[in-house]
């Protein structure tokens, strides 16, 4: 009885490092699981290479447009020296907005479509397969064969409901990402060369940090809702509500867990962008390949995080109820 109590307490103390370590153990302990996740990641890899090429070309075009030197109001002379003040050559955001031509807008729409339809659907399929199989491997001592994984990777009856939850997650994720983009673009287009540059830089940095923190904290909760849909059969708004309940008091762990995977993905993307990866196919392949290798680990970690948050909450509830019983008995 005492050993069971100690075991329960140990489970309650899973921190970010413990979750990551346990996810690595689950992932690499079964070679068939590695092979299966690799095979299911191939379609995601292909479409993501295509998406990254478009995205990085778009980032280069955006950077070139935003950072173009300003033109004189009187003639076509271009001035790149901003050390003097002359109202004839003042900063005009409307000129930057005019540079976003039709081709740029079409490329932006196409990139958004690729992200929200084929890429997200393939990420969803990869996620639910990884979550379902990782949960089985987590709860069973027996290893699964590759044949067993192929025959029934997940419960098909939960597919539709899980997809509904993923649509909610997509909407919430996209709106917060657009919020971050809105802050950055406002700073570069309207505020960067204003008289109160330093003040606006501090305000925008603080706003960006706040929204990013919210995004990472809530990403853990949104990912938890998808895990709950796949494993528990709770969908949509109900899944989000349940995940909010179970993640209460665990936001710090969720924040750091999501920060690790967020930093990994963006570090790869920015590294590839700075070396001109969109012009050299090999760099894009390496970037996407490394991302797809770590992506299953993210969902295994989310599955463990959900189990741990649930155990903590249920244990706390049981302790509160037993405390009430003792108080009433006395």
Show the residue positions of the predicted features.
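Membrane-helix interfacial "entry" motifs
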Residues: 29, 100, 104, 108, ...
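Lumenal/extracellular segments of secretory-pathway membrane and secreted proteins
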Residues: 40, 59-114, 118, 147, ...
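Eukaryotic endomembrane system proteins
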Residues: 112-206, 213-227
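Membrane-interface helix starts
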Residues: 25-39, 158-163, 248-256
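Juxtamembrane transition segments at transmembrane-helix termini in multipass membrane proteins
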Residues: 2-11, 18, 22, 43-92, ...
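Hydrophobic alpha-helical transmembrane segments of multi-pass membrane transport/permease proteins
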Residues: 32-57, 118-122, 167-177, 259-267
């Amino acid at each position: 009885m005492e050993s069971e109590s100690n075991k329960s307490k140990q489970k309650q103390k899973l921190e970010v490092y413990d979750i990551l370590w346990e996810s690595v153990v689950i992932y690499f302990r079964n070679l068939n699981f590695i092979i299966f996740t690799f095979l299911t990641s191939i379609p995601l890899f292909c479409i993501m290479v295509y998406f990254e090429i478009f995205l990085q070309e778009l980032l280069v075009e955006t950077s070139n447009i935003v950072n173009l030197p300003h033109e004189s109001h009187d003639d076509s002379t271009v001035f790149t020296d901003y050390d003097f003040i002359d109202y004839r050559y003042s900063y005009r955001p409307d000129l930057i907005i005019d540079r976003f031509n039709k081709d740029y807008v079409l490329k932006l729409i196409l990139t958004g479509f690729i992200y929200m339809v084929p890429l997200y659907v393939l990420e969803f399929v990869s996620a639910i397969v990884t979550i379902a199989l990782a949960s089985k491997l987590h709860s069973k001592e027996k290893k699964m064969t590759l044949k067993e994984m192929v025959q029934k990777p997940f419960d098909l009856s939960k597919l539709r409901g899980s997809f509904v939850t993923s649509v909610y997650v997509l909407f919430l994720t996209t709106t917060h990402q657009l919020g971050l983009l809105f802050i950055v673009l406002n700073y570069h287009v309207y505020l960067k060369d204003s008289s109160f540059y330093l003040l606006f830089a501090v305000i925008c940095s603080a706003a960006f940090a706040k929204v990013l923190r919210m995004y990472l904290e809530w990403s853990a909760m949104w990912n938890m809702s998808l895990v709950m849909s796949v494993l528990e059969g709770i969908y949509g708004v109900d899944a989000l509500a349940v995940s909010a309940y179970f993640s209460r008091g665990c936001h710090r762990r969720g924040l750091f867990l999501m920060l690790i995977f967020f930093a990994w993905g963006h570090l790869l993307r920015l590294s590839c962008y700075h070396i001109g990866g969109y012009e050299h196919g090999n760099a894009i392949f390496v970037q996407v390949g490394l991302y797809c290798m770590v992506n299953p680990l993210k969902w295994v970690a989310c599955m463990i995080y959900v189990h741990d948050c649930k155990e903590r909450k249920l244990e706390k509830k049981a302790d509160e109820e037993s405390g009430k019983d003792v108080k009433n008995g006395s």
